[in-house]
C-alpha cells in the first residue's frame, strides 16, 4: 500500500525534478537467528535550472530506502547560482576529510569531474565546470563537500549587496578600462626606466 502511494508521488515529482541514484550500500548485522540486511541509498534530485537536493535513506528494502532518500532530498533543496552554464567563481567545498575544488569553465568545456560532482552539477543545470576531489573519496563525504561548495557560491550582485559597494568593471585586457589601465601602467614603467 505504501509503495502505491509513493509511485503516485513519483509521477507528480518526475515532471518537476530529475532523480539520480548515486549508490546503494548494503549492511548486515548478525543476530542469533542469522544475519539481517539493511540498505542505504544516496539520491540526488534536480530540475537542471539551479535547484538541486541530496538525501540518504535507510531501510530493510531498497525501494523503501530510495523513497526515503528522495523525501530527504526534497527537503534539502538548495539554489545554485548558474551564470552562462557555469559557476560564478572558484570554491573549495569541505566535509569531514573530503575536499572538492570547483572551478568555472568556458563554453564547450563540459563538466570535467568525478562521478559524484558531475551528477550533482548536471542536475543543477551546470554545463561547464572543472572539479578535483582532494582527500577522502568516500561518495557520501564528496557529495556533502560539493553541496558545501555550492551553498557558499555568491554572484557579483550578491557580493555587492553584502558589502554595500558597487561592482567595479573588469580590468581584463579585453575591456576598454583594462586596456587603458594596461597602457598607463606601461607608460609609467617606461618613464621611470628612462629616469634611472
From Swiss-Prot:
It comes from the Bacteria. GO terms for biological process: translation. Residues 164-196 are annotated as: Disordered. One of its GO terms (cellular component) is cytosolic small ribosomal subunit. PROSITE patterns: RIBOSOMAL_S5, S5_DSRBD. Keywords: Ribonucleoprotein, Ribosomal protein, RNA-binding, rRNA-binding. Residues 17-80 form the S5 DRBM domain. One of its GO terms (molecular function) is structural constituent of ribosome. The keyword Ribosomal protein applies. With S4 and S12 plays an important role in translational accuracy. Located at the back of the 30S subunit body where it stabilizes the conformation of the head with respect to the body. Part of the 30S ribosomal subunit. Contacts proteins S4 and S8. HAMAP family: Ribosomal_uS5_B (MF_01307_B). Belongs to the universal ribosomal protein uS5 family. The N-terminal domain interacts with the head of the 30S subunit; the C-terminal domain interacts with the body and contacts protein S4. The interaction surface between S4 and S5 is involved in control of translational fidelity. This is Small ribosomal subunit protein uS5. It comes from Deinococcus radiodurans (strain ATCC 13939 / DSM 20539 / JCM 16871 / CCUG 27074 / LMG 4051 / NBRC 15346 / NCIMB 9279 / VKM B-1422 / R1). The lineage of its organism: Bacteria, Thermotogati, Deinococcota, Deinococci, Deinococcales. The gene is rpsE.
Amino acid at each position: 500500500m505504501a509503495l502505491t502511494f509513493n509511485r503516485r508521488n513519483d509521477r507528480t515529482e518526475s515532471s518537476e525534478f530529475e532523480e539520480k541514484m548515486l549508490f546503494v550500500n548494503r549492511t548486515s548485522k548478525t543476530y542469533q537467528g542469522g544475519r539481517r540486511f539493511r540498505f542505504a541509498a544516496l539520491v540526488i534530485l534536480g530540475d537542471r535550472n539551479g535547484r538541486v537536493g541530496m538525501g540518504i535513506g535507510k531501510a530493510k528494502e531498497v525501494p523503501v530506502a530510495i523513497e526515503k532518500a528522495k523525501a530527504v532530498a526534497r527537503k534539502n533543496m538548495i539554489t545554485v547560482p548558474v551564470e552562462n552554464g557555469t559557476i560564478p567563481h572558484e570554491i573549495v567545498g569541505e566535509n569531514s576529510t573530503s575536499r572538492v575544488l570547483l572551478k568555472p569553465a568556458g563554453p564547450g568545456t563540459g563538466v570535467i569531474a568525478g562521478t559524484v560532482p558531475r551528477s550533482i552539477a548536471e542536475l543543477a543545470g551546470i554545463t561547464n565546470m572543472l572539479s578535483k576531489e582532494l582527500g577522502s573519496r568516500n561518495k557520501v563525504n564528496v557529495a556533502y563537500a560539493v553541496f558545501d561548495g555550492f551553498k557558499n557560491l555568491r554572484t557579483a550582485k550578491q557580493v555587492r549587496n553584502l558589502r554595500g559597494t558597487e561592482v567595479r568593471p573588469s580590468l581584463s585586457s579585453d575591456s576598454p578600462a583594462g586596456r587603458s589601465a594596461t597602457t598607463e601602467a606601461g607608460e609609467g614603467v617606461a618613464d621611470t626606466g628612462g629616469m634611472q
